[in-house]
């Protein structure tokens, strides 16, 4: 798709969303569905991150695969969350369609501009569905991190079972990108005790290293378990006293 045309369409979508979106978050989604919805947005950001890395490296075939994954793999989750908001749903679908059809030989600068506008659309959809006090709650963010790690492990298994080639490379890159997004999410939890945050961050860094080196599945899965065990040691006492922590599942 012509880059200029795609920019115009994306800017137009965002302008419509800003003037027509609902101001109150949709309260109909269960807690677990809200985690899945935000997880799908974070995974989309992971695919965009992986696509950008391949665009910079000139790997257009790999970039193209990453660009196609959000609408192929994640749109159903986003659609299920947005079914009561059909206008925003159609705008998200169109944005992901534009992403899929982006020329993988695009310059990194132009891709950054396109990605920024797509992320604005996704964040606006998120603000419609997820109340701010839920999204900013540290327990919710930790649950999104768990969701990202579950999907990262799934992608790694797909990479191991792929038999090699570009498909395998893309699955490993997806796995790594989802851990990066988990790390970014962790760094937004300012209320978490510094020692706990550092311990969990160290475990995530070790996991990224194992994924990049394409270590055997049992080694990587052990580290996934280590990360989740570290995350599960976090209690209400590990947050600043002025933070109200919600219980998972409600």
Kindly label every feature range from the protein language model:
Residues 1-27:
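Secretory targeting signatures
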Residues 25-250:
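Mature extracytoplasmic or organellar-lumen-exposed domains after removal of signal/transit peptides
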């Amino acid at each position: 798709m012509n880059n200029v045309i795609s920019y115009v369409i994306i800017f137009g979508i965002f302008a419509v969303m800003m003037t027509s979106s609902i101001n109150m978050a949709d309260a109909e989604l269960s807690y677990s569905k809200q985690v899945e919805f935000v997880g799908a947005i974070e995974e989309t950001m992971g695919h965009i991150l992986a696509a950008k890395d391949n665009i910079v490296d000139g790997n257009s075939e790999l970039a193209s695969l990453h660009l196609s994954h959000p609408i192929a793999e994640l749109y159903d989750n986003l659609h299920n969350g947005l079914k009561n908001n059909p206008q925003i749903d159609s705008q998200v679908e169109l944005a992901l369609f534009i992403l899929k059809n982006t020329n993988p030989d695009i310059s990194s600068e132009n891709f950054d501009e396109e990605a920024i506008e797509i992320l604005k659309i996704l964040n606006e959809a998120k603000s419609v569905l997820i109340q701010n006090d839920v999204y900013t709650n540290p327990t919710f963010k930790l649950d999104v991190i768990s969701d990202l790690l579950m999907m990262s492990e799934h992608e790694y298994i797909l990479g191991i079972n792929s038999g090699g080639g570009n498909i395998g490379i893309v699955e490993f890159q997806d796995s790594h990108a989802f851990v990066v997004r988990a790390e970014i999410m962790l760094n937004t939890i300012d209320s978490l005790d510094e020692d706990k945050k550092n311990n969990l961050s160290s475990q995530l860094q070790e996991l990224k290293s194992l994924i990049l080196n394409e270590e055997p599945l049992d080694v990587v899965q052990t580290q996934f378990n280590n990360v989740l065990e570290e995350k599960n040691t976090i209690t209400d006492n590990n947050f600043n006293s002025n933070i109200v922590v919600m219980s998972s599942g409600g």
